C-alpha cells in the first residue's frame, strides 16, 4: 500500500513497517541534494514532528514523521550519496523505515491519485 502526505512524503507499508521517503515532486522542487540527516534507529517519532533533514543547493527542508512509530532502519546509502534521494526518491532514495504504532492510520493519508491532484 502506497500513501502520501500533504508534506510531500510517501509511505509504502509492508506488514506494520512503513518505508518513508520524499516524493518525486519534493525532490524536483529541492533540486540537487547535497546532505541528508536521518533519525536514529530506535527513535520514537510522533506524527508531524521533524524526523529528517534534506538539504539541496537551494534550501534545507525538514522531513516530517508521517505517522507515529519507532525507526527500525535508516538508509545509510542516502546519507553517503544524497543525490540518490533526488534521482530515485521513491526507490533507492528511501530515507527510513518506521514500525507504526497504528498501521490503520495509513487509511487517513492520500492515495496516488489524490496526491497527484494535490501536488499540481
From Swiss-Prot:
Any single Gene Ontology cellular-component annotation: glycine cleavage complex
Annotated Lipoyl-binding domain ranges read 17-99
Specify whether Coiled coil is a keyword of the entry.
Answer: no
Query: Which parts of the sequence carry N6-lipoyllysine?
Result: 58
Q: Which PANTHER family match?
A: GLYCINE CLEAVAGE SYSTEM H PROTEIN, GLYCINE CLEAVAGE SYSTEM H PROTEIN-RELATED
Q: Which family does it belong to?
A: Belongs to the GcvH family.
What does the subunit section of this Swiss-Prot or TrEMBL entry state? The glycine cleavage system is composed of four proteins: P, T, L and H.
What is the name of the protein in this document? Answer: Glycine cleavage system H protein
